[in-house]
Amino acid sequence: MARMFPERLDPSTESSAEKRLYAIFRDRLPQDFVVFHSVRWLLREPSQGAWNGEADFVIVHPERGLLVLEVKGGPIRYEARTRQWFSGPHPIRDPVGQARRNQHDLMEKLRQHPRWPDRPILFGHAVAFPDVEVGPRDLLPDLPRAIVLDRSDLRDVERWVSRVFSYWKGEHASMGGPGSDGMAVLRDVLARSWSLRPLLRSAVEEAEQRIVELTEE
């Protein structure tokens, strides 16, 4: 079983496709995989200001690399004349553009961390249409079949993830995973637990103020 962040699916998750994939990744990927669901970040560049980013899934293997996955459920359609995507009758955002943009934004977010490894690390993006079967053809010039997860791929999702990593790596033998040091940074950036407690001095001052208020009453 893969290690999941969060370890239980957020009850607020509305997408049935994401719910289904969460369980499949958890149960069918080996334990050396780490999968982050519904990852959000805020990225800022001095010349551009700040903007939000969110990825449906980030799939990471310490030796293979990092994959950003955008999920769209239901029947999928693309209208070339208007460049509009649809899920059933509903217009949706371009999933390829979302995945590509989120990949680059997440790369930049991680590289801003002082402990992110200074070596070639494989980043890639992919799109999931888990409710339909795509067939063997590439869907668009920027959406080859190799980076599309469809219903037929769910039977062996580990094989599909391996295929995507191989597609992005190509002949770049030096490209690899983040390693144990990079995995630690990923958890620190995307899934860090923390708590804030009042300083003792603040607590004492509040107690003293309360005594004054009670005395005045």
Give the residues covered by each predicted segment:
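Intrinsically disordered, low-complexity Ser/Thr/Pro/Gly-rich regulatory segments
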Residues: 1-216
